[in-house]
Amino acid sequence: MIANLAKAANVNVQRILRVCIASNTTMNHLLLGVDSDPVRMEPYIPSFFSWDGLRGIDLRLPAHPDAPVILAPNIGSYVGGDITAGTFSSMIWNRDEMSLFIDLGTNGEIVYGNRDFLMSCACSAGPAFEGGDISCGMRATDGAI
């Protein structure tokens, strides 16, 4: 994806000097080649929450070899870097009023709160869109939402 975007923008990948990645906890583990079994087995604790010191060359990314790679930190087993990045970019952590941030995909994550506190939770959302053994649901296609 990086190479395609750089090509479309007519940018030499060697000029990409920083890479930020926001993915769920399991994808973070797979990206770094870390065993992801702890995420899916009791007590559902990730092998890591954050990972510092990555460079483009470490992940064989099409970017400058020394480009720092910032991996959005995991909050928990099913609340990963994707929801961390969404919470940060939506600025709900800095608001006076109570706010709700929802990320729906195969898993659903919800963050609720304001500058005083934030709480999060996760749930399986895929079956609601895929119709897997439930009476009301459909595939993730036009009209699903």
Predicted regions and their residues:
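Short, well-ordered alpha-helical packing segments
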Residues: 2-6, 20-22, 84-88, 108-111, ...
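Alpha-helical architecture
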Residues: 22, 80, 101-103
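Glycine-rich phosphate-binding loop and adjoining helix at the ATP-binding site
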Residues: 31-85, 129-133
